[in-house]
């Protein structure tokens, strides 16, 4: 009995740490993207850009809409926990580097280059999201998936609160060149739990179960799949349309 109890405690601690790991990864995506999509609109308005141009700024979110296009490639390349970790870490390092670069630019004079870099940053964060979601699905049992899903929701909405609210106030006080480097550092710090998490384990996928190019087409030909797709589009459009 005494020998089992410490093992149970260690397993519980590992599960909590793993949940915290995924929360950090999800909030690392949400805070910078929420800040950029909100702050750029404010700064562009202050610099007298037209409302039409500001409205087109929403197109920077396109990478997150079409990230399913490169998701099968990530699934094929990632087999072990280390493969997923490597994909997430590289994506976040590039994400942080792009945020730092954006911080050296001026909205008034470099807006189009800034938008280009923001699009690239959302490509990298979208790639991180694909790998993180896959790792979460493979790490947790069916009965525990609701917990990691709650970490995703907390990270997304908490990130929107911090990025679109708190950091906007910080922007007014400290300026663009201070907040963006802070965001880059924040993204790097959010990687630390993943780096030190030794509890992540998955069953390695046999080669025959890896995603193939034909699976992309097969997915959309499943019976009843379009009803689910339409439901999810309307559901998430309603959620994010209010943010």
Task: Give short role names for the model-derived ranges.
Residues 2-15, 199-230:
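Juxtamembrane intracellular "pre-TM" segments in multi-pass secondary transporters
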Residues 5-64, 226-227, 231, 236-243:
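Helix-loop boundary and gating motifs at the non-cytosolic
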Residues 64-67, 146-171:
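Glycine-rich segments within core transmembrane alpha-helices of 12-TM secondary carriers
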Residues 72-77, 103, 160-178:
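Transmembrane alpha-helix termini and helix-breaking/packing motifs in multi-pass membrane transporters
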Residues 83-86, 169-186:
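A membrane-interface helix-boundary motif in multi-pass transporters
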Residues 89-108:
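C-terminal ends and interior cores of transmembrane alpha-helices
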Residues 90-96, 178-196:
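Symmetry-related core transmembrane helices of the 12-TM Major Facilitator Superfamily/SLC fold
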Residues 121-155:
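Cytoplasmic helix-loop-helix junction between adjacent transmembrane helices
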């Amino acid at each position: 009995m005494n020998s089992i109890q410490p093992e149970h405690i260690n397993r519980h601690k590992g599960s909590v740490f793993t949940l915290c790991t995924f929360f950090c990864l999800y909030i690392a995506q949400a805070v910078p993207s929420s800040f950029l999509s909100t702050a750029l609109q404010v700064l562009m308005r202050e610099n007298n850009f037209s409302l039409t141009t500001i409205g087109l700024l929403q197109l920077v979110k396109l990478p997150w809409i079409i990230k399913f296009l490169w998701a099968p490639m990530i699934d094929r390349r990632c087999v072990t926990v280390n493969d997923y970790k490597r994909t997430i870490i590289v994506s976040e390092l590039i994400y942080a580097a792009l945020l730092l670069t954006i911080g050296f630019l001026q909205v008034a004079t470099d807006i189009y280059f800034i938008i280009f870099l923001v699009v690239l940053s959302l490509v990298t964060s979208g790639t991180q999201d694909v790998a993180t979601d896959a790792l979460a699905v493979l790490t947790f049992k069916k009965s525990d998936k609701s917990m990691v899903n709650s970490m995703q929701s907390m990270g997304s909405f908490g990130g929107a609160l911090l990025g679109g609210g708190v950091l906007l106030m910080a922007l007014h006080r400290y300026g663009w060149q201070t907040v963006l480097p802070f965001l880059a550092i924040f993204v790097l710090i959010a990687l630390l739990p993943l780096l030190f998490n030794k509890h992540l384990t998955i069953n390695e996928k046999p080669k025959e179960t890896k995603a193939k190019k034909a699976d992309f087409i097969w997915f959309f030909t499943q019976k009843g799949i379009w009803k689910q797709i339409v439901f999810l589009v309307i559901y998430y459009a309603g959620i994010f349309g209010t943010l």
